[in-house]
A protein has these predicted regions:
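Acidic, glycine-rich low-complexity segments
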Residues: 1-61
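A broadly tuned preference for mixed-charge, low-complexity surface segments
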Residues: 49, 60, 130-154, 230-253
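A broad, structural micro-motif
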Residues: 51, 76-78, 180
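Extracellular/lumenal ectodomain signal focusing on beta-strand-rich modules
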Residues: 55-58, 80, 99, 184
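Structural motif
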Residues: 79-86
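Non-catalytic peripheral regions of nucleotide-handling enzymes
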Residues: 98, 205-255
Length: 255
């Protein structure tokens, strides 16, 4: 059930909860949060209706609208991709998307939770002229980094680094937006895809990221991949590259 709205500032937005997505016009009367290690709370709407939300801390790795993904048909905006579409992957050639999902992030939530704000990776900031165009991603979205230090520190030609762990390096910073949509897509395995000319990850289901999708989207994933309901199934969905911890990423990028 949806009820159309315009949030403060006159910009349309949607608020997603784990079970419900509501789009409405008018301001929010109040926002309340419970700090219990995740972000939980309640939104009181002008109409008097209340909406619960939870696990906003678990913002999953996502692209934002306008990001161009390399496909056999050329670059396509990520928001146009659907299940069954083929995408160019670094390791396994053309692969069909198994599932696509998204999370709406209204300005009210971003203002109350600044750590959820998208991160801008400026063109060229990953080295070797990559990405080719500015790229806006969620804080947990991981990108491929390949340089002399990946060999020196980790004996790896390429590693995955979360965008939030790149903060402080030249050309990477949080941005203030009125609202945004985080879009994610998944394959039969964790893949590396070309986005705005840079190699970045597809969605990888794990205990953390599965909390970040709503109940209905999580059900869709389990219908496609029933093995992911078990810990051993999640463990078998391996990461495409070594993923650096925050301290490892900082060590690699320090002057």
């Amino acid at each position: 059930m949806t009820d159309h709205v315009e949030p403060e500032g006159g910009n349309s937005s949607t608020l997603a909860t784990s079970d419900l997505m509501v789009t409405r016009t008018g301001g929010f009367n109040s926002f309340s949060f419970v700090d219990d290690g995740a972000t939980h709370g309640e939104v009181l709407l002008d109409s008097g209706a209340r909406m619960q939300f939870q696990d906003l801390e678990a913002v999953i790795p996502c692209f934002t609208p306008g990001t161009k993904i390399a496909t056999p048909r050329g670059e396509r905006p990520v928001e146009e991709l659907r299940s069954g579409d083929r995408v160019i992957t670094r390791d396994n050639g053309l692969q069909e998307i198994a599932w696509v999902g998204q999370i709406q992030m209204p300005g009210t939530v971003l203002k109350a939770n600044p750590h959820l704000k998208p991160i801008l990776i400026k063109a060229g900031s990953l080295g070797n002229g990559l990405p080719e165009k500015d790229m806006l991603v969620s804080p947990n979205h991981r990108v491929i980094v390949a340089n002399d230090r990946t060999h020196l520190f980790f004996d790896e030609s390429e590693v995955l680094v979360a965008s939030k762990h790149l903060l402080g390096t030249a050309g990477v910073h949080e941005v203030d937006v009125i609202a945004t949509t985080y879009i994610h897509f998944m394959f039969e395995r964790h893949e590396v895809v070309l986005s705005n000319g840079a190699w970045t990850e597809s969605f990888q289901p794990d205990d953390f990221s599965l909390k970040g999708v709503g109940n209905s989207q999580r059900t869709e994933i389990f219908e496609l991949f029933p093995e992911l309901e078990e810990k051993r199934g999640v463990a078998a969905y391996e990461t495409a590259r070594r993923s650096l911890r925050e301290e490892e990423a900082q060590a690699m990028f320090q002057p």
